[in-house]
Amino acid sequence: APGLRDIRAAARAMHHILFAHGLSAEAMRSLGTSNIGVVLNLTEAHPASNRPCDVKAKDRLDGIHNRWFLDAIFKGEYPQDILKKLNEFMPENFEDDMSLISESIDWLGINYYTRGIVADDPGEPWPSLKDIEGSMDKTQMGWEIYPEGLKNLLLRVSKNYTGSLPLLVTENGMACADEVQNETVYDPSRIDYIFSHLAAARAAIDEGVNLQGFFYWSLLDNFEWAFGYEKRFGIVHVDFETQKRTPKASFNEWALSLNS
């Protein structure tokens, strides 16, 4: 439930979502499906300072958000530094599930929006993390715009986990307070966001990453979970009263780039 803080429930959910992936992939393979992948929400972790306690906090963030899922799928094990804290909350005999979780896949999708900067917060329960606001420009969601993090993640995942396996950027985008004026929407910050992240992806390809696709989030303004219709990610504006669609300037720039 929203707002619930239960480490036992969290540990089991983190395992069971991976086990569900393994069961689903097994079932699809048995039906002859040959193009199976999984999408992970990854965050490049940064320490708030060079203090050892903050560096360790960064490692905890990375372990929970990134390595827990990557290690399970590609190595058949959970990162020991995180498992050491979560082991007592895990399902009985969870180790028996790891071979299924780590069955081979045909591609990996990565959702990337921003980096995470954390400091150690010893007054909080484990993982004792305090989010720190970055210095770069922010989206309407309050997320720092950090395209370098996408390149770094692609390089790291390719080097440490996937090798030549195809990668896809399955989500990347920003929310803006878009308004229609004179039958158009001018969104230069989104244009900058899109092309800076495309440049980061291109740089990763140039360094050997087998990146096969890039999907912007999203084509249309839509319902954004707890934020409802307030946060607009689309490159096409939607009037939610009339359902009228208005392509934004970013839509036109994207189309031009695809045709050039």
Where are the regions that the model predicts?
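Active-site region of glycoside hydrolase catalytic domains
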Residues: 1-260
